[in-house]
Design a protein with these regions (language model features):
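Helix-boundary and loop/linker segments of multi-pass membrane transporters
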Residues: 74-78
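Conserved signal-transmission helix
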Residues: 65-71
């Protein structure tokens, strides 16, 4: 292996620990986001039965400050979804990186006939990508449902402003 190849290999191996840590953090965050989402879904369901605004963040924000424009409410919605949107996009990338980094040592172990080392490297690689994809799937789903909720809330605010009351 040339010195340039060794340098590239060495640098890539330095990223394994931080990337695995990032995948674990994103995985944990995804379940935090799922819990917050389920709580909001419960609040919205209960609010529908009771006729309150609980769980309807944009409607609550508008009720507190009726001078908020549609653009400001939309910015609030985007801010509320931002972290989960980032996780849904970054987690698969980090999962791919976490898969590729151990592949080099796994292939080297295969070439050297060290099947136990190869197995360990592949276990790390595939475990990381699985966790990353689960994190991405959870956050993707929560973002898309919230996007619909916020669109409904914005529509309700617009109807309220124009006096058009629809069910």
């Amino acid at each position: 292996m040339s010195s340039l190849e060794q340098l590239l290999y060495g640098i890539s191996q330095l990223f394994l620990g931080p990337v695995l840590l990032a995948v674990l953090i994103l995985f944990g965050y995804a379940f935090h986001a799922l819990g917050a989402f389920l709580m909001q879904a419960h609040q919205r369901s209960r609010a529908r039965r009771l006729g309150s605004l609980e769980g309807h963040e944009l409607l609550l924000a508008h009720a507190r400050d009726t001078s908020l424009t549609d653009d400001e409410l939309e910015a609030l919605a985007l801010k509320r979804m931002e972290r989960a949107r980032i996780v849904s996009r970054v987690a698969p990338m980090l999962g791919l990186v976490a898969t590729m980094i151990p592949m080099g040592p796994a292939l080297q172990s295969l070439a050297d006939g060290q099947f136990a080392d190869m197995s360990r490297s592949l276990t790390v690689a595939f475990s990381a990508v699985i966790l990353a994809l689960i994190a991405a799937a959870i956050t993707y789903a929560t973002v898309h449902v919230r996007r619909r909720w916020y669109a409904q809330d914005l529509l309700a605010v617009q109807r309220k402003r124009t006096g058009d009351v629809q069910p």
